[in-house]
Amino acid sequence: MNSILREASPKSPHVHFNAIEGILELKGRSIPENALDFYKPLIEWMGEWVKSSPAKTEFHVHLEYFNTSSSKCLLDLFRKLEPLGDNATVLWHYEADDEDMLEAGEDYEAILSVPFRMMKV
């Protein structure tokens, strides 16, 4: 399975889905013109990743900001991890003074069966 590496742009996050190490990362801002176009290949990759039965998956999410359409796509990404149970963890990184981002992570945690860890930076 191939890894994915995309550099950040002013409207889209840095993406590094490392298939060898099982470490997935989204970092930056997520306000693409068409969130589905941006996230669809990532969601499909995640589906294949889960089918490969990885021993461990760490999904680091460190977003400064994301829009509503990105929010739905993030939910779809996280849902793909649910079959992995405790073998997958979402590490939700947020700035110490960013209560909105902390609450967003807690909202995802409340509606999903994927373990989340809130990481204050």
Tell what function each PLM region has.
Residues 18-20:
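Structural motif
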Residues 22-28:
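Short, aliphatic-rich beta-strand segments
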Residues 42, 58-109:
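Amphipathic alpha-helical interaction surfaces in cytosolic regulatory modules
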Residues 10-16, 31-55:
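A short, well-ordered alpha-helical element
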Residues 116-121:
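A generic structural motif
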